[in-house]
Amino acid sequence: MENAVYVLLGITSVVCVAVIGWRAWMLRWNSVVPPELVTALADCRSREDAKNVRSLCEKNPSPLGRLIRLTVDRLDWPKDDNIDSLETAARHEIVHLERGLVVLEVIVGIAPLLGLVGTIAGMMTVFGDLGQTGLNDAAKLAQGIALILRATLAGLLIAIPSLIFWSYFSKKVEVLAVEMETLCDEFIRRQYRK
């Protein structure tokens, strides 16, 4: 039983590292909010400029680029309808940015529990053996208890970094979402000036 727990903890740790690497790569600031697009948005003053921005969005796909491209495509819509459409698309982009974070959240919960299951299974084995042989060798008992507590330690060593990165990535998604919202809002305000 303890071996199965260690295998599950090993799989959990590999998944944790993979998700952390994947999200770190996907949530790079410059890939979500490309600086060249931010500059183009700041320089965009007319509907003619908006066509150039749209072209830039097509060449450099990013969450911000997809939102701006959608907005440019709907500039002939009434402002409120364009904003509603943008808000819906933004929610989809945020869900896309949050992808994988639930895996880290689950690992935070299950890794310590898997460790605890390993510890309990090991304790049952140690005390079962103790019941059969008696308490003749206290050092052997202490070694057995130390060995089985490693499962709890392993679970915690997986859960703690998972919690740290889950918190970090969740906050980063929030900050990126606010930045995209601000840039889109400024762009729409300039395009619908009367």
What are these regions (language model features)?
Residues 8-21, 107-117, 158:
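Lipid-exposed faces of alpha-helical membrane segments in multi-pass integral membrane proteins
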